[in-house]
């Protein structure tokens, strides 16, 4: 079991203010966590590849498709600064050519 001094040090590092009852509770909980890691360290993981998660997560996206907005002309003409079929927007990047 973890001693009080270790719990106090961990609480200090975590910027936690705990009372003596909480110290006892944290000591039991931290000891349980360390016991669990001790059990895990007994497993043979030599042929197990390192990973950051239990299952692979990937984005599921649809394919992009190019299509016109039904009222494209109306939309462009009602914009603050239309230029042909496009929106004129303020420049946000400076280039060396300016």
Curated annotation (Swiss-Prot):
Keywords: ATP-binding, Ligase, Nucleotide-binding, Protein biosynthesis. Disulfide bonds: none annotated. GO terms for biological process: glutaminyl-tRNAGln biosynthesis via transamidation; regulation of translational fidelity; translation. Its EC number is 6.3.5.-. GO terms for molecular function: asparaginyl-tRNA synthase (glutamine-hydrolyzing) activity; ATP binding; glutaminyl-tRNA synthase (glutamine-hydrolyzing) activity. It catalyses: L-glutamyl-tRNA(Gln) + L-glutamine + ATP + H2O = L-glutaminyl-tRNA(Gln) + L-glutamate + ADP + phosphate + H(+); L-aspartyl-tRNA(Asn) + L-glutamine + ATP + H2O = L-asparaginyl-tRNA(Asn) + L-glutamate + ADP + phosphate + 2 H(+). Allows the formation of correctly charged Asn-tRNA(Asn) or Gln-tRNA(Gln) through the transamidation of misacylated Asp-tRNA(Asn) or Glu-tRNA(Gln) in organisms which lack either or both of asparaginyl-tRNA or glutaminyl-tRNA synthetases. The reaction takes place in the presence of glutamine and ATP through an activated phospho-Asp-tRNA(Asn) or phospho-Glu-tRNA(Gln). Heterotrimer of A, B and C subunits. Belongs to the GatC family. This is Aspartyl/glutamyl-tRNA(Asn/Gln) amidotransferase subunit C. The lineage of its organism: Bacteria, Bacillati, Cyanobacteriota, Cyanophyceae, Oscillatoriophycideae. The gene is gatC.
